[in-house]
Amino acid sequence: RKILILFVVALIGFASCADSKQSMTVTVTNSLALERAGEMVEVPMSDVVAKLKLADTAQIVVLDVDGQQVPYQVTYDEKVVFPVTVGGNSVVTYTIQPGTPAPFDVIACGKYYPERLDDVAWENDLGGFRAYGPALQARGERGFGYDLFTKYNTTEPILESLYAEELNPEKRAKIAELKKTDPKAASELQNAISYHIDHGYGMDCYAVGPTLGAGVAALMAGDTIIYPYCYRTQEILDNGPLRFTVKLEFNPLVVRGDSNVVETRVISLDAGSYLNKTVVSYTNLKEAMPVTTGLVLREPDGAVVADAANGYITYVDPTTDRSGANGKIFVGAAFPAQVKEAKVVLLSEKEKKDRGGADGHVLAISEYEPGSEYTYYWGSAWDKAAIKTPDAWNKYMAEYAQKLRTPLAVAY
């Protein structure tokens, strides 16, 4: 009997030792007074594999303090990313261990649309975005900046269905036919399929043109913005469920007489965030230059915040319908590193014509060193969705910038 008890105790001890080897505790510390809800943290997959001694085919689960599964994603650069919630000045723990993950809803995702002039469009639960491609440029259209899709009444992906309806070949043919015989019916059908009209889930009511749009970065020669054009190549690196990442490379720019400066952007959007992280680099640049992130202004006296010290800029955009029927779009950019200067720059009457009627930009200007990376965050919200007022948007942006400058500490 004594031998049996000792054997059972030994077995329990062995099992508990094995369990401890087969789990990894991740401690997340928030040193700000602000709650951090749904913020993504990253753990290198190589560390998880080493810690858990995982076989190549093994799966993992991420558990919260109550033992409930948390959705996660392994990214293209081999990181386990998952959302955490931690109160102000607090610490929370998560556990990573072998197991079969539950199915996760796809929240952040995107697609390349060769059928729509090479658009790359992506979204999460809060909004959508797009960058224009080489086919648009080949047509002579000047769409330099990022475009926006508003979103409400759903957290599910909608862009694929919006594009499918907008580009529906049968309906397009019908519209062309009706234009000859019944222009009113043609217009009604056009409106019924257009993503420029809100059909209950959101729309594209943002004007870009030959501007920096909703937050493109550009080098500056003195006070002159060197506008990038459409991307040249695209590669989707992550496509959900929690993070979308795309790499865009651009045609060579002419910078101070050098015609071989090539810009690369890596843009990622996480579930639950209004802002895209963007990492910009320029190859073959020979000297340090100012780099700016800009938000196009469509009203010269529009509501603008340009706060260099606290690292963010915002603007209230009137949308393409100045009557107010489409509400207002809040746009903004936030910066983890120190911003040299933030200001409004209005255009002359001649420049307005060159920039499609835009009034100017609110700019955040930093210094770019050759061989480095310039990282910033940009995005938008809509007053028909969760963020209703400019004050609420400015608060979100100010807190976002604070969080960027005081990141969560992750230990394991």
Q: Residues of each region from the PLM?
A:
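Beta-strand-rich recognition/accessory modules
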Residues: 79, 335-412
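Acidic, contiguous internal or C-terminal segments within carbohydrate-active enzymes
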Residues: 233-291
